[in-house]
Structure formats: C-alpha cells, structure tokens
C-alpha cells in the first residue's frame, strides 16, 4: 500500500508490563493500533493510567472500544488519539475505528483498514480453541457480500483463537488479542 509499518495489539487488560514494552517500539512503527479491552476492571485508576499511556505516543494511535471498556466515554475523551467513530486518512489509507456493539457498520464502508474488537464470524480468528465461534455475524456478512471496502480488519476479543490471521473474501483479518503472557502479543503489518 504505502510503505507504512503498523503495530497492532488488543486485549491488554491493563497488563502491568505491557505498556512500557509497547512504548519501547515507538521508533520502529509508523502507526499504533489497539482493538479494545484496555481495562482489566472498571476503575478510575486504570482509565487514568491508560489515558496517560496513550497520550505519550509520538506516532498516530488508533483505538476502538472493547467489551471491557464499556461505557467507552473515558476512552473517546482522550484528545490525542483516534477513537470510536473516527474515520481518518493517513498517507492515502483510510482507517476506521468501529465502536463495540456498533449500530451501523456501513458507516465505515469506505475504510481501507477497520479496527473492531470482535472478529468476523466463521473465521479462524473468531473461533476459540474449544471450537466456539465468538465472531460478529454482521461483519462477516458485509465482507462476504463486498459491502465493505476494507482490505484489513484489526481485531481481538478471542484470546486463544484457532489462528491469529485469516482471510475472508480477500480481506486479511488480524486477531492480536493478548492472553496474559508476560509480554503482550502483537502483530507487525506492513502496508
């Protein structure tokens, strides 16, 4: 696409060592993307620390809310990041930040890259190792019917999916959910 290097992680759940670990990559990546579930529990302390951390990035940061971030007003009030509902073009690539439980995914139909917490249903990124599908049926339907322009979906939610990457109707899906390991799981995506 445009010679950009993207960092993608999800489901950090306020992992103690994750924040400094990720910040150390600032010079290695052009854009940082996080697909929700920043919080472990709904506490003012966690929200404050995450907000400070997100504000400390020197590169563009895109985020979407996850089920543990509800209500997401705290996340969406951080001025220096692109959050829920945002559509922003950088170097000709249109990013869209889909809120958790989005009412109308078609608002993001023209985006090249979508950040969404829940992966499309019936993909190896949405099916857990115990064979339960936790994916978004509507998102999968829109992709299958070519109603979204997106070429890349950045998601999480499923901590141990069958696979962290899949392709549905030509759309690359990256599930970068961390599973509580000492170091956060992340994916490096070259555009």
Model-assigned labels for residue ranges:
Residues 9-90:
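Core catalytic region of metal-dependent phosphoesterases/phosphodiesterases
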Residues 72-78, 90-91, 104-109, 163-169:
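Short loop/helix-cap segments at secondary-structure boundaries that form the rim of catalytic
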Residues 7-11, 32-37, 61-67, 82-84, ...:
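Active-site neighborhood of phospho(di)ester-bond hydrolases with catalytic His/Asp-centered motifs
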Residues 13-17, 95-108, 138:
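Catalytic core of the metallo-beta-lactamase
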């Amino acid at each position: 696409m445009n010679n950009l290097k993207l960092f993608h992680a999800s489901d950090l759940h306020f992992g103690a060592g994750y924040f400094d670990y990720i910040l150390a990559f600032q010079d290695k990546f052009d854009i940082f993307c996080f697909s929700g579930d920043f919080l472990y529990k709904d506490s003012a302390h966690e929200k404050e620390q995450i907000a400070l951390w997100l504000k400390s990035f020197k590169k563009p940061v895109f985020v979407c809310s996850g089920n543990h971030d509800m209500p997401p007003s705290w996340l969406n009030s951080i001025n220096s990041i692109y959050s829920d509902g945002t559509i922003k073009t950088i170097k000709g690539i249109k990013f869209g930040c889909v809120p958790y439980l989005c009412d109308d995914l078609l608002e993001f139909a023209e985006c090249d890259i979508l950040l969404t917490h829940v992966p499309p249903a019936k993909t190896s990124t949405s099916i857990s190792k115990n064979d339960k599908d936790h994916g978004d049926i509507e998102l999968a339907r829109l992709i299958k019917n070519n109603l979204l322009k997106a070429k890349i979906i950045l998601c999480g939610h499923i901590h141990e999916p069958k696979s962290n990457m899949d392709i549905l109707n030509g759309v690359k899906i990256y599930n970068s959910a961390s599973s509580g390991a000492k170091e956060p799981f992340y994916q490096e995506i070259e555009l």
